[in-house]
């Protein structure tokens, strides 16, 4: 008889980023004090769950978000590169509306195709590696629960893919807040529900 397995896909907490750049996969970006508090709130919310593994992206902010969750269950944080942030041409630059890289005509070619997208890792590639990460986690924690800590675009792309929606989207409409939890509920290897929560919301 199939058994229920849950994979909780957590977005990392707030990052210390005083210059406001798109940090992407750059090293050295750690959680802010608020981000650390958000990670602790997620750990509290998951404290009574049947967590048997905590797996994180190799980036510092994801590892720091995973640490208190793992500690509550007496587990070590494991690392899976499939959970890493998406690659982006604008990494290391400011990309806010009205300033930064978008004002430079030399980079406009990178914005030509929002459907792939032309400025970064293809959505289909993100979906493929995130699905691989979740499938590994599901098998690892069969009959129990596993936490995977990742990043906004990978988590949102995974959710779109698993729920049969198109992958290209308006980034402003992502339902994936800092330190949010997207819980994937499986009956055996069949996804039966997706539950979104924000345990760190103020």
Swiss-Prot record:
Q: Name one GO cellular component term.
A: cytoplasm
Q: What are this entry's molecular-function GO terms?
A: phosphatase activity
Q: Keywords in UniProt for this one?
A: Isopeptide bond, Ubl conjugation
One Pfam family in the UniProt entry: His_Phos_1
Q: Which InterPro entries match?
A: His_Pase_superF_clade-1, His_PPase_superfam, PGM_Phosphatase
UniProt crosslink position (Isoglutamyl lysine isopeptide (Lys-Gln) (interchain with Q-Cter in protein Pup)): 136
Q: Which SMART domains match?
A: PGAM
Instruction: Return the protein name.
Output: Uncharacterized protein Rv0525
Protein species of origin: Mycobacterium tuberculosis (strain ATCC 25618 / H37Rv)
């Amino acid at each position: 008889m199939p058994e229920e397995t849950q994979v909780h896909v957590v977005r990392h907490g707030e990052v210390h980023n005083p210059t406001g750049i798109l940090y992407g996969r750059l090293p050295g970006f750690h959680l802010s004090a608020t981000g650390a508090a958000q990670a602790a709130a997620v750990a509290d919310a998951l404290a009574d769950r049947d967590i048997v593994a905590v797996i994180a992206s190799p980036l510092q902010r994801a590892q720091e978000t995973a640490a208190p969750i793992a500690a509550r269950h007496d587990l070590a944080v494991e690392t899976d590169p499939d959970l890493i942030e998406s690659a982006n041409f604008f990494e290391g630059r400011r990309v806010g509306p009205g300033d930064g890289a978008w004002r430079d005509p030399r980079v406009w070619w990178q914005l030509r195709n929002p459907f792939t997208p032309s400025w970064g890792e293809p959505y289909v590639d993100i979906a493929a590696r995130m699905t691989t990460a979740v499938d590994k986690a599901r098998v690892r924690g069969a009959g129990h629960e596993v936490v995977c800590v990742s990043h906004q675009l990978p988590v949102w792309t995974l959710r779109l893919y698993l729920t049969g929606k198109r992958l290209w989207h308006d980034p402003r409409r992502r339902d994936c807040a800092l330190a949010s939890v997207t819980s994937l509920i499986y009956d055996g290897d069949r996804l039966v529900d997706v539950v979104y929560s924000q345990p760190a919301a103020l």
